[in-house]
A protein has these predicted regions:
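Hydrophobic, small-residue-rich alpha-helical packing segments that form membrane-like cores
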Residues: 1, 8-9
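N-terminal intrinsically disordered, low-complexity, charge/repeat-rich segments that act as generic
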Residues: 2-4, 326
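Active-site beta-loop-alpha junctions enriched in small/polar residues
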Residues: 11-15
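Active-site microenvironment of metallo-dependent hydrolases
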Residues: 19-33, 39, 43-326
Length: 326
């Protein structure tokens, strides 16, 4: 039977995955292994996406079209790239870039993480609640996908501050675009060692997101990311005294202008550090970076509030009333 128009695309592939597994070529091989004819896969990688995006000057080898081409080695079904051309110029050969990187092109996009200096005091979770034990909304993550379930946890409040350390993992979102929004939430579903991770690679607003087991570790991780101009950092220890891995992303807080091989090495180190910390997931990068994706069910966190994605509504941090009071 004739298949309907089909696009094969990628989303959220970290640099280490691209270097080791591939990009669209990997998707193509998966599709062929699943039973799709190679010529259908080729069309779904090229012509159909170009038409869908109204990029009518590309997507097919034809006179007058843009010469964005990939020369494949061997059989089509293997989708083994040998030479890559962009605009008619050879830019890659056998998996290696063959063009000279031009300096100075990203300067206008650097220095875009606009937050104050990060210290422990910024990770005090202050609330307008009386002393006692209160029920708070929490986010529960899982080891498979990006679904975050709404949950609850009881935590003590004393002097207007939630005593969360040694009781739960905490996630904080801090606006990094010059705003003053800060939101906290407990995070359930992970048995983590002492430490923290901070990142500005956090869809879709890419604010400064920090997850940790102590205020000191969270401050250390976030300070590392801010010093790098954006990126990802994983720290170990109750005070975050050891940086386990870091991936600077100073271009808009989400990109790097350095060679792919180096970025891939750093991404692999971050992935390994997250897994060693206890962040068990099929894709740790995706799991961490989508806690703020407020269009993905079910409970997400932004710099303005927690969001009930199904109801499309902001929700408060507390659930019901306090259970005890001093």
């Amino acid at each position: 039977p004739q298949l309907p128009p089909l696009c094969l695309v990628t989303d959220d592939l970290a640099a280490d995955h691209i270097v080791t597994e591939g990009h669209l070529d990997h998707i193509a091989r998966v599709a062929v292994a699943a039973g799709f004819p190679p010529h259908v896969v080729l069309r779904a990688l090229t012509w159909t996406p170009a038409q869908r995006l109204r990029l009518y000057d590309r997507g097919v080898v034809s006179p007058g079209k843009r010469a964005d081409l990939v020369l494949l080695r061997g059989e089509l079904a293997a989708f083994d790239p040998a030479v890559v051309l962009a605009g008619g110029q050879v830019v890659g050969r056998d998996g290696t870039a063959v063009y000279e990187a031009r300096s100075g092109e990203t300067g206008a996009l650097e220095g875009r993480v606009d937050v104050e200096a990060q210290d422990e005091d910024g990770f005090r979770w202050r609330v307008d609640l009386p002393d006692g034990t209160h029920r708070f909304r929490a986010m529960r993550v899982n080891p498979r996908d990006t679904y975050t379930e709404a949950a609850e946890i009881e935590l003590p409040v004393s002097g207007g501050e939630v005593a969360w350390e040694a009781r739960t993992v905490l996630v904080r979102v801090r606006n990094r675009h010059g705003g003053d929004g800060v939101v906290f939430a407990p995070l359930l579903g992970r048995d983590l060692a002492e430490g923290a991770v901070a990142t500005t690679y956090a869809h879709d607003s890419h604010n400064l997101v920090t997850i940790g087991t102590s205020r000191a570790a969270m401050a250390a991780a976030s300070a590392t990311v801010v010093a790098d101009g954006g990126g990802v950092a994983v720290v170990r220890g109750a005070a975050g005294e050891s940086v386990a891995a870091r991936m600077p992303l100073p271009v808009g807080g989400v990109l790097s202008a350095r060679p792919a091989a180096r970025v891939a090495e750093e991404a692999g180190a971050v992935r390994a550090a997250l897994e060693a910390w206890g962040w068990e997931h099929l894709n740790p990068f995706m799991s961490v970076s989508t806690l703020t994706l407020a269009v993905s069910p079910a409970l997400k966190i932004t710099d303005r509030s927690l969001v009930d994605v199904v109801r499309r509504a902001p929700v408060g941090a507390t659930v019901g009333s306090s259970t005890t009071r001093d």
